[in-house]
């Protein structure tokens, strides 16, 4: 039985798939299985995968296009490893990624997942020195990072190695999400386990024109669902974090909820969320300004953000 199951999600990235696959083969830690999950690609991905002669490669082809998280759940059902790695077919791992993550997990049973530092690359594999998705490569400390995950998704999916036990206890990914299901999954894990972080850049996230992260309308719908789901959970953390930290986190989550409500065409609910955010933190001047902005046409509100 392999120690690591690598869930290699594939969808119409044949240009990048061989590079991603080779970065798996180049890992210094070799006790793994590769479960290649093709979600209905039409660009030759299936044929390329079928041509690979690797004894630890399992192929699962889905013709109905389940989406990222439904596809990952199929992979979880097939996985036999003690640890689960998620790897997108357009990203790249550096050779010691799995080795270092295994060492951290083996020595810290309280850690449920460990992620690494990294950087963004372009379609040609060159490092990006800007913030192409509007944020820096996500980083955390090792420890209890649950509140940090309220502020933003601080974990890149391809940077993660998680215990299979986490998925066995909490269930798999929520297939109702388009692009934020990994954020929701890491959040659920962080509610019950600590999160480990390796400060070495071992994961390269490729940014190109076909990234799902560019489909903003669907991402905003995801954020609306996620922020609504998080709000009632915060009260249950009262014995875990200082009240001042919880108050700021509540205010932030409500302000973010207000913004995605406005972005998705519900300005009345947005104003209510912004006002509730200000009740917890009256110093949030952006929330005051955005209450006024919700009275503007939706297209203008989007431009003002």
For every predicted segment, state its role.
Residues 23, 30, 38-47, 64, ...:
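A conserved acidic beta->alpha catalytic loop
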Residues 15-18, 41-51, 92, 96:
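Acidic helix N-cap motif at the loop->helix transition within catalytic regions
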Residues 96-129:
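Conserved donor NDP-sugar-binding/catalytic core segment of glycosyltransferases
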Residues 207-305:
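C-terminal subregions of glycosyltransferases and related glycan-biosynthesis enzymes
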Residues 84:
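Short aromatic/hydrophobic "clamp" motif used to bind/position activated sugar donors
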Residues 77, 135-226, 265:
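Conserved nucleotide-sugar donor-binding catalytic segment
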Residues 62-79, 89, 100, 144-146:
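Glycine-rich, basic loop-to-helix element that forms the pyrophosphate-binding segment
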Residues 1-25:
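N-proximal low-complexity "stem/linker" segments adjacent to membrane-targeting elements
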């Amino acid at each position: 039985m392999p120690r690591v199951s690598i869930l290699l999600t594939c969808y119409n990235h044949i240009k990048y798939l061989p590079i991603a696959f080779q970065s798996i083969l180049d890992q210094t830690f070799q006790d793994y299985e590769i479960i290649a999950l093709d979600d209905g690609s039409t660009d030759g991905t299936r044929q390329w995968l079928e041509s690979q002669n690797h004894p630890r490669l399992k192929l699962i082809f889905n013709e109905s296009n389940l989406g990222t998280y439904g596809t990952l759940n199929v992979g979880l059902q097939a996985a036999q490893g003690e640890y689960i790695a998620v790897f997108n077919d357009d990203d790249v791992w550096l050779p010691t990624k799995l080795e270092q993550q295994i060492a951290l997990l083996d020595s810290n049973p309280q850690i449920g997942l460990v992620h690494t530092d990294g950087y963004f690359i372009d379609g040609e594999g060159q490092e990006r020195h800007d913030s192409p998705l509007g944020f820096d490569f996500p980083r955390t400390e090792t420890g209890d990072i649950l509140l940090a995950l309220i502020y933003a998704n601080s974990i890149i999916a391809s940077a993660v190695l998680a215990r299979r036990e986490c998925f066995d206890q909490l269930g798999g990914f929520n297939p109702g999400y388009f692009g934020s299901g990994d954020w929701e999954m890491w959040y659920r894990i962080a509610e019950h386990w600590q999160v480990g972080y390796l400060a070495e850049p071992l994961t390269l996230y490729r940014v190109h024109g076909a990234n799902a992260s560019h489909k903003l309308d669907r991402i905003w719908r995801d954020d609306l669902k996620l922020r609504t789901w998080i709000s009632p959970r915060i009260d249950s953390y009262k014995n875990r974090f200082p009240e001042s930290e919880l108050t700021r986190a509540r205010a932030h989550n409500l302000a973010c909820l207000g913004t995605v409500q406005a972005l998705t065409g519900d300005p009345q609910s947005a104003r209510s969320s912004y006002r509730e955010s200000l009740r917890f933190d009256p110093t949030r001047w952006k929330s005051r300004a955005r209450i006024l902005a919700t009275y503007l046409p939706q297209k203008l509100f989007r431009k003002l953000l």
